[in-house]
Amino acid sequence: MAGLLRFLLSKGRALYNWAKSHVGKVWEWLKSGATYEQIKEWIENALGWR
């Protein structure tokens, strides 16, 4: 858990900006039953963190 928190804090601004512009898409992912790991992977790929 601490590792995830450190990761989010270090990537906070980019993650916030991405989420703000893609909130509808993330909501659709959640409604369709996407798992935390899938969403994390999609976000990492979208931001080029992978």
From Swiss-Prot:
TM annotation in the entry: none
Induction: Mainly expressed during the logarithmic phase.
One example of a Gene Ontology biological process annotation: defense response to bacterium
GO cellular component terms, semicolon-separated: extracellular region
Temperature dependency: Thermostable. Retains virtually all of its activity after incubation at 100 degress Celsius for 3 hours.
Keyword Secreted part of the UniProt annotation: yes
Sequence positions bearing N-formylmethionine: M1
Keyword presence, Secreted: yes
Localization per Swiss-Prot or TrEMBL: Secreted
Principal location listed in the UniProt entry: secreted
Keywords: Antibiotic, Antimicrobial, Bacteriocin, Cytolysis, Formylation, Plasmid, Secreted
Note from the entry: Highly resistant to proteases.
Function: Has bacteriolytic activity against Gram-positive bacteria B.subtilis, L.lactis and M.luteus and several species from genus Staphylococcus including methicillin-resistant S.aureus, with MIC values ranging from 0.11 uM to 7.8 uM. Has no activity against Gram-negative bacteria or fungi. In vitro, has a dose-dependent cytolytic effect on eukaryotic cells.
Name recorded for this polypeptide: Bacteriocin BacSp222
Lineage: Bacteria, Bacillati, Bacillota, Bacilli, Bacillales
